C-alpha cells in the first residue's frame, strides 16, 4: 500500500507541467524525464501535441525534418541545439515503463528573436484611387537582460508615428482586432499602423511612397522599408488584366458565333451544290421513265392490232371455206 502511494505521488509530480522557459536563438535546451532508463520500455516525444519521435531501447525513429541535424533523442531526454525562433512551442515526453506505468514530462519553450514585420495591404481600390494600410509589428524581441529605453517609429520623412517603450498604449490583441491598454511588457504584438492614399496619375516625388519602420535602443537598431505605391500599382495592373479579360470575352463569343454562321453557310452551300447536281439526274430519270412507258404502250398497241388482224383473217378464211 505504501509503495503504491509513493508511486502515485511520483507520477503526479512528474505529470506537473513546467512553466514557460525563455531561450535566445542558438541556445541549447534539454528536456528529460526522471524515470530510470532501465525501467523504460519506450518513449513518445511530442511537439505541439504531434509525435516527432519514438525512442526504444534499440533505436529512435520518426524525426521531423527540421530537427534532424539539431536534435538528439533518447529514452529519457530530448536535446535541441542551436535553437531557432520557430522551435518555440510545447514539448512533451511520454515514457511507457515496463511495469505499465506511464510517466509524462512537459516543457513550454519560448525562443526569443528580433523579428519585426512591416507589411502593407490595400483597403480600398478603384481605377484611379488606392488606400493602403501599413503596419509594423513586433513579432518577437530578444530582451537580452537589462532593458534600455526602446523607441519605435513608422512613417515617411514628413509624416510618422512615434512609440516609446515602456507604454500602455497600442497593445494589439488579435482576438479583439483592436488596440487596448495593458501592461508594457512583453513587447510582442505591439504595433503601429498608418494609412496612405495614392492617385494613379499623380506621382509625388518627395518620398511619400517610401514607408520606414525603425526600432532602436542604446544597443540595438532595426530598420525596414516598404514602398506602398508599388502595392497599389500591382493591384491596378491586376484590375486592368481582369477588365481586359472581361472585355475580350464578348469578342471571343462573336468569333465563335461568326465561325458557327460560316459553318452553317458552308453547309447550306454544300446542300445547294448537292441539289444542283441532283436536279439533272432527276430529270433524266423522269425522261427515261416516260420513254419506257411510251414504248411499252406502243408495243401493247401493236400486239393488240396484230391480234385483231389475225382474228379477222381467221374469220374471213372460215367464210370462204363455206
Curated annotation (Swiss-Prot):
InterPro entries: Ig-like_dom_sf, Poxvirus_F5/I6_dom. Induction: Expressed in the early phase of the viral replicative cycle. It holds the Pfam family Pox_I6. It is found in: Host cell membrane. Keywords: Glycoprotein, Host cell membrane, Host membrane, Membrane, Signal, Transmembrane, Transmembrane helix. Coiled coil: none annotated. GO terms for cellular component: host cell plasma membrane; membrane. The keyword Glycoprotein applies. It is a single-pass membrane protein. The keyword Transmembrane applies. One of its GO terms (biological process) is viral process. Glycans are attached at residues 36, 41, 72, 79, 108, 144, 219, 245. Residues 1-20 form the signal peptide. Plays a role in the spread of virus to neighboring cells ex vivo. Belongs to the orthopoxvirus OPG049 family. This is Protein OPG049. It comes from Variola virus (isolate Human/India/Ind3/1967). The lineage of its organism: Viruses, Varidnaviria, Bamfordvirae, Nucleocytoviricota, Pokkesviricetes. The gene is OPG049.
Amino acid at each position: 500500500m505504501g509503495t503504491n502511494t509513493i508511486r502515485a505521488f511520483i507520477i503526479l509530480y512528474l505529470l506537473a507541467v513546467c512553466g514557460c522557459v525563455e531561450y535566445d536563438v542558438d541556445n541549447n535546451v534539454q528536456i528529460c524525464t526522471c524515470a530510470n532508463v532501465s525501467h523504460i520500455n519506450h518513449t513518445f516525444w511530442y511537439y505541439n501535441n504531434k509525435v516527432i519521435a519514438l525512442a526504444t531501447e534499440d533505436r529512435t525513429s520518426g524525426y521531423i525534418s527540421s530537427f534532424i541535424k539539431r536534435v538528439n533523442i533518447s529514452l529519457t531526454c530530448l536535446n535541441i541545439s542551436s535553437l531557432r525562433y520557430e522551435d518555440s512551442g510545447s514539448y512533451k515526453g511520454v515514457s511507457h515503463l515496463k511495469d505499465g506505468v506511464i510517466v509524462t514530462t512537459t516543457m513550454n519553450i519560448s525562443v526569443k528573436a528580433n523579428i519585426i514585420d512591416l507589411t502593407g495591404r490595400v483597403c480600398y481600390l478603384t481605377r484611379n484611387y488606392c488606400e493602403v494600410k501599413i503596419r509594423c509589428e513586433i513579432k518577437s524581441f530578444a530582451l537580452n537582460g537589462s532593458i534600455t529605453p526602446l523607441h519605435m517609429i513608422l512613417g515617411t520623412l514628413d509624416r510618422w508615428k512615434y512609440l516609446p517603450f515602456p507604454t500602455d498604449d497600442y497593445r494589439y490583441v488579435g482576438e479583439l482586432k483592436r488596440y487596448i491598454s495593458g501592461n508594457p511588457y512583453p513587447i510582442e504584438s505591439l504595433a503601429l499602423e498608418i494609412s496612405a492614399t495614392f492617385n494613379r496619375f499623380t506621382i509625388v516625388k518627395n518620398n511619400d511612397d517610401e514607408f520606414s519602420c525603425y526600432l532602436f535602443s542604446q544597443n540595438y537598431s532595426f530598420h525596414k522599408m516598404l514602398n506602398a505605391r508599388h502595392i497599389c500599382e500591382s493591384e491596378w495592373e491586376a484590375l486592368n488584366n481582369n477588365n481586359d479579360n472581361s472585355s475580350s470575352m464578348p469578342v471571343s463569343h462573336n468569333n465563335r458565333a461568326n465561325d458557327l454562321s460560316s459553318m452553317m453557310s458552308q453547309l447550306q452551300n454544300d446542300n445547294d451544290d448537292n441539289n444542283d447536281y441532283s436536279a439533272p439526274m432527276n430529270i433524266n430519270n423522269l425522261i427515261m421513265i416516260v420513254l419506257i412507258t411510251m414504248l411499252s404502250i406502243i408495243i401493247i398497241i401493236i400486239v393488240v392490232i396484230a391480234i385483231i388482224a389475225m382474228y379477222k383473217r381467221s374469220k374471213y378464211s372460215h367464210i370462204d371455206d363455206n
